[in-house]
C-alpha cells in the first residue's frame, strides 16, 4: 500500500506545468506525492500536449486526474509558434483556464490551490481572480532562480562583470552563469523576459516550490526562505528509484517521446558492470554536424561501450564510419530511451549530459558520474554544481567556436572510466545518491516540506 496520511478533509490541487517534457515530469511526480498524503490532484496541460502524449504513453497517471486547456496552438504546440508562443499562451491560456475553473466549480468541485510553473506567472493572476491560493513551482536549481531574481531586482547589473555572487553559493565566473545572463544583448527577447517575469507577482503567491533537496543547496535554500514560504520537494523522480514508498511508481507516465526501451535494456544487459558511457542531451538540443563528428570521434577514441540518444531528425549528421562500430556491438544509437532505467542499470558507468536540471537530479539520485557538457540556459551553472561543488563529475569545455573537441571529451570520459579521479568521483556520486534518498524518505527534508504544505492547505 502507498503511504496515506490521515487528514480531516481531502483538499484539491490543480497542477499546471509548462508544456515541455522536462517541466511536466516534476509536476507529475509531485502530484503522486501529494496523492499519497491524501490530496486530490488534477494535472492541467495543453490540448496539444495531451493529444501528443496519448500517442506514445504506455503507462498512465491513473491516480492523477487530467484536464486540458488551450494554449492557442492546439495543432502544433509551442514548437510551432516560435517567440510568439509565450504571449499567445498567456492570452488564450488565461481565458481557457478561467473557463475550466468555472466548469469544475459548477460541477461542485472545489479547488483549494493552484500550483503553477514559474514560467507561467499569469496563472497566479487567474487564481487570485477566483480567490484561490497559488504556488509557484520552479523546475530549475535554487541557485539559478536566485541569479535571475537578483537581476530582476537590480541587485546584479548587466552586462556581468568577470565574477558574480549570490548568497549561499560560491563565486561564479561569468561563463558559469546561465547563458542568457552572459549574452545580455538578448535580454529583451520574449524568452529572456519570461525568465525574469517569473518574479513579477511572486510575492502574491502563498507558496514557492523548488525541485531540489535541502542538502544539495543548503545555504541558497536558507537564504531563499527569508523572502518566500519555500517548500523544497525534490528530487521529483518516480518512487521506485528513491524511497520505494509509492506502489508501482516506476515511470512518469506522461511521455511525449517513444522510447526504444527493450532494445536499450537488452543491449545493456550484455555489457559488463560500469562499462557503458551513456550520452544524451535532452529533448531540445540540436547539434551541428561538426559537433556530432567530434562526439563520435571522442567515443571511438575512448574505446568504450556507448549508448547514444540522438533524435531521428539528427541521424543524418552521424558520420558513416560510426556504423562499423555499431555493427561490432560496442555502440548503440537510439532516438529516445527511458533515461531513468538506463541510469539505474549497473552496466552504466558514466553519463555525458547537457546538464538540464532534470538530468542533473537523475544522475545525482542514481549515483552516476557525469561528464558535463552544457549547451544553453541554466546548464552552465548546473555543470559547476556537479563538478566543482558536489564532485560527482567533470566539465568539458568548448573551444572559441562553441565546439567541444574530441580530445577534450575523450579525456574527460577516460578520467571517469579509468583514472584515479574517477574513483573519487564515483565515491562522491554514491554519497549524493544516498542523501537524495534520505530527503524523500519519511521524515526526510523534502517529505517534511510536503507534509507541511498539506497541513497549511488544510488550514486554509
Swiss-Prot record:
Listed InterPro entries: UDP_glucos_trans, UDP_glycos_trans_CS
GO MF, one example: steviolbioside glucosyltransferase activity (stevioside forming)
Keyword annotations from UniProtKB, A to Z: Glycosyltransferase, Transferase
Enzyme Commission (EC) number: 2.4.1.-
Catalytic residues as annotated in Swiss-Prot or TrEMBL: 23, 117
Catalytic activity: steviolmonoside + UDP-alpha-D-glucose = rubusoside + UDP; steviolbioside + UDP-alpha-D-glucose = stevioside + UDP; steviol + UDP-alpha-D-glucose = steviolmonoside + UDP + H(+); rebaudioside B + UDP-alpha-D-glucose = rebaudioside A + UDP
Matching SUPFAM superfamilies: UDP-Glycosyltransferase/glycogen phosphorylase
Amino acids binding an anthocyanidin: 23
Domain of life: Eukaryota
Gene3D superfamilies: Glycogen Phosphorylase B
Binding, UDP-alpha-D-glucose: 139, 339, 354, 358-359, 362, 378-379
Induction annotation: Induced by blue light and far-red light.
Enzyme class per UniProt: transferase
Keyword Glycosyltransferase recorded: yes
Intrachain disulfide bonds: none
Keyword Transferase: yes
PANTHER family: GLUCOSYL/GLUCURONOSYL TRANSFERASES, UDP-GLYCOSYLTRANSFERASE 74E1-RELATED
Function: Involved in the biosynthesis of steviol glycosides in leaves. Converts steviol to the mono-glycoside steviolmonoside. Converts the mono-glycoside steviolmonoside to the bi-glycoside rubusoside. Converts the bi-glycoside steviolbioside to the tri-glycoside stevioside. Converts the tri-glycoside rebaudioside B to the tetra-glycoside rebaudioside A.
Leftover remarks: Leaves of the 'sweet herb' Stevia rebaudiana contain a mix of steviol glycosides, compounds that are unique in the plant world because of their intense sweetness and high concentration in leaf tissue. Stevia leaves have been used as natural sweeteners in South America for centuries.
Family indicated by similarity: Belongs to the UDP-glycosyltransferase family.
Protein name: UDP-glycosyltransferase 74G1
Organism in which the protein naturally occurs: Stevia rebaudiana
Amino acid at each position: 500500500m502507498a503511504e496515506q496520511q490521515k487528514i480531516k478533509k481531502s483538499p484539491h490541487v490543480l497542477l499546471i506545468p509548462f508544456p515541455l517534457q522536462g517541466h511536466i515530469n516534476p509536476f507529475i511526480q509531485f502530484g503522486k506525492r501529494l496523492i499519497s498524503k491524501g490530496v486530490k490532484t488534477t494535472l492541467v496541460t495543453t490540448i496539444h500536449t495531451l493529444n501528443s502524449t496519448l500517442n506514445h504513453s504506455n503507462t498512465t497517471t491513473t491516480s492523477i486526474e487530467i484536464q486540458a486547456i488551450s494554449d492557442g496552438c492546439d495543432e502544433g504546440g509551442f514548437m510551432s509558434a516560435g517567440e510568439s508562443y509565450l504571449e499567445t499562451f498567456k492570452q488564450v491560456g488565461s481565458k481557457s483556464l478561467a473557463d475550466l475553473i468555472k466548469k469544475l466549480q459548477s460541477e461542485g468541485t472545489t479547488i483549494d490551490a493552484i500550483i503553477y510553473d514559474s514560467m507561467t506567472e499569469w496563472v497566479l493572476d487567474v487564481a487570485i481572480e477566483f480567490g484561490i491560493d497559488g504556488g509557484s513551482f520552479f523546475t530549475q536549481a535554487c541557485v539559478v532562480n536566485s541569479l535571475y531574481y537578483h537581476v530582476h531586482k537590480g541587485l546584479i547589473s548587466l552586462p556581468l562583470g568577470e565574477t558574480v555572487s549570490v548568497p549561499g553559493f560560491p563565486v561564479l565566473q561569468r561563463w558559469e552563469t546561465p547563458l542568457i545572463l552572459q549574452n545580455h544583448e538578448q535580454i529583451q527577447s520574449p524568452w529572456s523576459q519570461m525568465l525574469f517575469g517569473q518574479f513579477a507577482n511572486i510575492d502574491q503567491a502563498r507558496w514557492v516550490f523548488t525541485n531540489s533537496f535541502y542538502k544539495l543547496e543548503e545555504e541558497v535554500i536558507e537564504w531563499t526562505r527569508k523572502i518566500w514560504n519555500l517548500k523544497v520537494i525534490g528530487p521529483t523522480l518516480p518512487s521506485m528509484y528513491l524511497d520505494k514508498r509509492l506502489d508501482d511508481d516506476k515511470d512518469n507516465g506522461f511521455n511525449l517521446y517513444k522510447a526504444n526501451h527493450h532494445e536499450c535494456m537488452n543491449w545493456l544487459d550484455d555489457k559488463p558492470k560500469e562499462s557503458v558511457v551513456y550520452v544524451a542531451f535532452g529533448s531540445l538540443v540540436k547539434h551541428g554536424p561538426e559537433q556530432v563528428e567530434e562526439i563520435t570521434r571522442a567515443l571511438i577514441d575512448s574505446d568504450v561501450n556507448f549508448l547514444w540518444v540522438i533524435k531521428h531528425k539528427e541521424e543524418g549528421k552521424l558520420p558513416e564510419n560510426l556504423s562499423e562500430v555499431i555493427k561490432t556491438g560496442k555502440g548503440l544509437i537510439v532516438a529516445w530511451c527511458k533515461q531513468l532505467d538506463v541510469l539505474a542499470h549497473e552496466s552504466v558507468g558514466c553519463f555525458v549530459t547537457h546538464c538540464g536540471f532534470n538530468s542533473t537530479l537523475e544522475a545525482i539520485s542514481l549515483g552516476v558520474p557525469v561528464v558535463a557538457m552544457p549547451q544553453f540556459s541554466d546548464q552552465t551553472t548546473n555543470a559547476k554544481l556537479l563538478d566543482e561543488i558536489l564532485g560527482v563529475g567533470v566539465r568539458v569545455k568548448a573551444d572559441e567556436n562553441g565546439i567541444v573537441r574530441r580530445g577534450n571529451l575523450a579525456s574527460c570520459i577516460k578520467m571517469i572510466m579509468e583514472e584515479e579521479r574517477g574513483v573519487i568521483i564515483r565515491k562522491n556520486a554514491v554519497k549524493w545518491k544516498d542523501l537524495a534518498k534520505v530527503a524523500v524518505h519519511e521524515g526526510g527534508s523534502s517529505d517534511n516540506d510536503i507534509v507541511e504544505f498539506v497541513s497549511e492547505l488544510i488550514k486554509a
